[in-house]
Amino acid sequence: TEGDRDISYPKNLIAFAEAQKDNQEIAFDKERDKMIIVFDADIFEEKVQDYDKLVASGEKDNILAVTNPAFELFLLLHFENSYEQDILPNEEAIIKNGKEGNQTFIYQLLLGKTGINSKKNSKIGDLAANVDTAISQEKKLNQDIHDCKGKITCNIGSIIESIRNDDGK
């Protein structure tokens, strides 16, 4: 949220989600509801240890939505044939996700498709109209967040699909 900045580190996101469960303004039902915590796994490729421990603790009372290397991957999946045209031919570069200036490789791929800054321009939300394309294409990727090191990974579409298919029982 606007008032909660600099908490993008996965461990901090999980702690933030846990704290929000006690926020009376959101009426979180601890018996029925779960927080969905979205984070990038690229930080665990080289810099940060204990990914497995973090996932195990985070999954206890939450749903973890993970992208490797970054959320821009999920956004890229909203474009028809982006898996075949953009992701598959660039697999190695996507996983390395090196920076050119301040921009990562996956960010640049998405920028090439959208022409907009996905981190600052709210028009990126228009991609939601193509979420079914993203869900379909995501199935061609690794969706197992327990085995994502060195693999292009995304499970956000599968979470959306499971929410859509939830009959509430």
Please annotate each region the language model reported:
Residues 22-36, 41-169:
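C-terminal accessory helical subdomains adjacent to catalytic cores in phosphodiester-
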Residues 1-32:
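Acidic, glycine-rich catalytic loops of TOPRIM or P-loop NTPase phosphate-binding modules used
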